Amino acid sequence: MREYNLFTSESVSEGHPDKMADQISDAILDAILRQDLHARVACETLVKTGAVILAGEITTTANIDVERIVRDTVNGIGYHHSDLGFDGETCAVINMLGKQSPEIAQGVDRADPEEQGAGDQGLMFGYASNETEVLMPAPIEYAHRLMERQSELRRAGELPWLRPDAKAQITLKYDGSKPVAIDAVVLSTQHDPSISQADLQEAIMESIIKQVLPAELLHAGTRYHINPTGKFVIGGPVGDAGLTGRKIIVDTYGGMARHGGGAFSGKDPSKVDRSAAYAVRYVAKNIVAAGIADRCEVQVSYAIGVAEPTSISINTFGTNKISNDEIIRLIRTHFDLRPYGITRMLNLLQPMYQQTASFGHFGRQGSETAFTWEKIDKAEILKADAGL
C-alpha cells in the first residue's frame, strides 16, 4: 500500500515586520562592506510603531549614515506614508550600536588569514533535494514564489490596493519523497480598506496563486484560504513588532531540514552562523546535483577561535549512491570549510546581503555577486571523484 504524507512550509513578504528588521540589518552591513571589507558587524534591529531601534557590535573604519540607510530601506520596502501606519521619513531611529569585544577579536583574527578562527561556536545545517529544479524543498520554494509575486504586483501597481505585509503557507502531499499534489494554500495580504473581500480573493487567486503554483499539483480537493480572517488593513510594524533573526525557518528550508539556531542577517562572513550555513548549502546542493544522493543534509560545527570545523556529518535519507563515509571524504577533499576558506570559496566579502533578507536565502539568483552558494560548479568534479 502506498504511503502519503503532508508537509507544510511558510514564507513571509518583505513588508513583514521581522523581514523589515532583517533588511535593515543587512542594508547596514552592505553599506559598511562597501567601505571596509574587514569590518566585523553584528547588527540587530527592532521595529515597532513609529520607531526603528538598532543594537549590536560593529568594528569598522567605515563612515556611514546609519539613519539615512534605515530610512531609505523602510521607504524602499513600501512603508513611506503615514496612511500605511509607518513612514520611513518620520519614524524615530535610535542607534545603540557599539564596538565588538576585543576578547572576541583576539580569538578570530590571525596574522595568517587562512587560520582565521570561527567567530563563535555553533552548528549549521545545509540541505538540498532533487524535488525542484533549484534543488529546494517544494513547500518552501512555492511559498517564497507566492510572496515574490505579491511583491511584484504591488510594486508594479497592477494590484494597487496591495500593501507590503503578507504571508503564504503551502501544504504539499508527498508520495514517499516525491511531491504529488498541493493539499492547501494559505495566503494573507495586507490591503487598502477600499477593496472588497470578494474582489481581493478573486485577484489573489487569479493573479498570484494560479500564476505561480504548478497546475499539475492543483486539483479539485486543494483547499484555499485567502485572507481567512477577513480584513487585513493594519499590518507591518503597527500590527506586530519585528526583530532581526526571527524568521530562521523561512530563511532556510521551511522546516524540511534541521536548523542550528543561528540567524543570518546583520552578520559579516566571519560569523559562521551565516557563512557556514551558506557553505553547507553549497556542499549539499553540489552533492545532489552530482547525482550522489537525491536528498542530502550536511551538518558542520565550530569552536570559537578555531579554524577547522569540529565535525562534519551527513544524512542522505537512504538515497545515497555511494557510502556516507565516501561522501564525507569528498566534502573534505573538495570544500574548504574553514571560515576564511568559506569566505574565499563563495566570495562573501561583497555588499550583496540585503537582497538575501527577503524571499529566502536559498534556491535563488540575484545580482552577479550574490547567492554564490547556489552554484553547482563542483558537481562534475564530485561525480568524477565518486566514480559515477
Curated annotation (Swiss-Prot):
GO cellular component: cytoplasm
PROSITE patterns the record matches: ADOMET_SYNTHASE_1 (PS00376), ADOMET_SYNTHASE_2 (PS00377)
MF terms (GO), sorted A to Z: ATP binding; magnesium ion binding; methionine adenosyltransferase activity
Classification via Pfam families: S-AdoMet_synt_C (PF02773), S-AdoMet_synt_M (PF02772), S-AdoMet_synt_N (PF00438)
Catalysis: reaction(s): L-methionine + ATP + H2O = S-adenosyl-L-methionine + phosphate + diphosphate
Residues noted as binding K(+) in the record, renumbered to the chain: 44
Primary localization class, coarse: cytoplasm
Cofactor(s) for this UniProt protein: Mg(2+); K(+)
Residue positions binding Mg(2+): 18
Positions with a binding annotation for ATP: 16, 165-167, 231-232, 240, 246-247, 263, 267
Entry-linked SUPFAM superfamilies: S-adenosylmethionine synthetase (SSF55973)
Binding site residues for L-methionine: 57, 100, 240, 271
Region feature Flexible loop, mapped onto this chain: 100-110
Keywords from the UniProt entry: ATP-binding, Cytoplasm, Magnesium, Metal-binding, Nucleotide-binding, One-carbon metabolism, Potassium, Transferase
GO BP annotation list: one-carbon metabolic process; S-adenosylmethionine biosynthetic process
EC numbers: 2.5.1.6
Function: Catalyzes the formation of S-adenosylmethionine (AdoMet) from methionine and ATP. The overall synthetic reaction is composed of two sequential steps, AdoMet formation and the subsequent tripolyphosphate hydrolysis which occurs prior to release of AdoMet from the enzyme.
Family membership noted in the UniProt record: Belongs to the AdoMet synthase family.
Subunit text: Homotetramer; dimer of dimers.
Family matches, as PANTHER family: S-ADENOSYLMETHIONINE SYNTHETASE
Protein's name according to its UniProt entry: S-adenosylmethionine synthase
